[in-house]
From Swiss-Prot:
It holds the Pfam family UPF0179. It comes from the Archaea. Disulfide bonds: none annotated. Belongs to the UPF0179 family. InterPro entries: UPF0179 (IPR005369). This is UPF0179 protein MM_0589.
Length: 149
């Protein structure tokens, strides 16, 4: 899905606002009996999405969301992470590799291991943000980047 590609899905009416980013968690037991589940569950679990447009203000009943759900257009949301400094070139296409570091106590751990990306994802570097060299506890030369996947 490119930036201009969208999918229609349903989201809780209290959450439905343009610009909202969320990680799709997947099917819940309550979804099995819902007649709208195919629309709700057409996203990839564990991935980050962004609401780009509210399709209508018609509220649909939902077994999970007490205030119902609204139809929205979503696109894949860019994800901020780190890459090796030598690969951090705006416009470059890369295969995502999480940093080879297991230091969970590091202040940059979540940047280096973001939710929503999977090892091997084909991504494009849309923006190079900053050097993480002075922040990396493992001594790896890294740059913070924004990736489109």
């Amino acid at each position: 899905m490119t930036e201009s590609d969208t999918k229609i899905t349903l989201i809780g009416s209290r959450l439905a606002r343009e610009g909202l980013e969320f990680i799709f968690k997947g099917e819940m037991p309550e979804c099995k009996k819902c007649r709208l589940k195919n629309t709700c569950l057409n996203l990839e679990p564990g991935r980050r999405y962004k609401v780009v447009r509210i399709k209508s203000n018609d509220i649909h009943e939902c077994f999970l969301h007490d205030s119902g759900v609204l139809a929205v257009d979503v696109s894949r949301a860019p994800i901020t992470t780190s890459v090796e400094s030598r690969k951090a070139v705006q416009g470059a296409k890369i295969m995502y590799e999480p940093a080879k570091c297991g230091k969970r106590e590091c202040a940059e751990y979540e940047t280096c291991h973001p939710e929503g990306l999977i090892k091997g994802d084909k991504c494009k570097i849309v923006e190079v943000l900053e050097s993480l060299d002075s922040k990396c506890e493992a001594g790896i030369s890294l740059k913070k980047v924004k990736l489109a996947w």
